Amino acid sequence: MLSATQPVSENLPAHGCRHVAIIMDGNGRWAKKQGKIRAFGHKAGAKSVRRAVSFAANNGIDALTLYAFSSENWNRPAQEVSALMELFVWALDSEVKSLHRHNVRLRIIGDISRFNSRLQERIRKSEALTAHNTGLTLNIAANYGGRWDIVQGVRQLAEQVQAGVLRPDQIDEERLGQQICMHELAPVDLVIRTGGEHRISNFLLWQIAYAELYFTDVLWPDFDEQDFEGALHAFANRERRFGGTEPGDDKA
């Protein structure tokens, strides 16, 4: 899956971006432009995943999180959902060994209980194979929704309260944050959405509280290393305030 790619160009400032999340949008529209069915676009999008993972691994990014299948995607036509599930199985079978060779740790975030037993087993084996790798952490959000993530975190705290190991007044942002997916990773610094839409679509609602947002009209199958570099360049030139004000600015 990974191949040697050039690091970001010399004129790109040190981007300081540790965790990038991508909403991979535009597969269906890309396929339509080619006169093909949507499944064709999803397969083409898998090639862009390879490019993005390779680029991230070679350019100082610690974690890459990709929105592969939202909890709302079950509402799509059954034929498309079936094609996506088969593509997921194929990707795990064909790519995980390459990820492992390149020291990438693979994790699936989301409620995998709705997937069939074959896919769940592939997920478990893939995560186990790469669990001790120390390079890029690749998170694939599958049957994931930001609201679901927060609710499952609250439910875990409620169970602790019910068991008598936690008092309600002990619940705070830190405790809840420890129950949310990817809590052990660096916070998301940059969210990229391809395909021209300007919305979050229930993705990582907790984790992107202070992330920079970058929207591009490029459809996901066309998103390449230059596009990724452009997003990092934009990020590097933004001033992040985390709710504060510009240094030296005493005016609210």
UniProtKB/Swiss-Prot annotation:
Protein name: Ditrans,polycis-undecaprenyl-diphosphate synthase ((2E,6E)-farnesyl-diphosphate specific)
Active site: D25, N73 (proton acceptor)
Naturally occurring in which organism (per UniProt): Salmonella typhimurium (strain LT2 / SGSC1412 / ATCC 700720)
Record-listed substrate binding positions: 26-30, 38, 42, 70-72, 74, 76, 193, 199-201
Similarity field: Belongs to the UPP synthase family.
One biological process term in Gene Ontology: polyprenol biosynthetic process
PANTHER family in the cross-refs: DEHYDRODOLICHYL DIPHOSPHATE SYNTHASE 2, DEHYDRODOLICHYL DIPHOSPHATE SYNTHASE FAMILY MEMBER
Family annotation (InterPro entries): UPP_synth-like, UPP_synth-like_CS, UPP_synth-like_sf
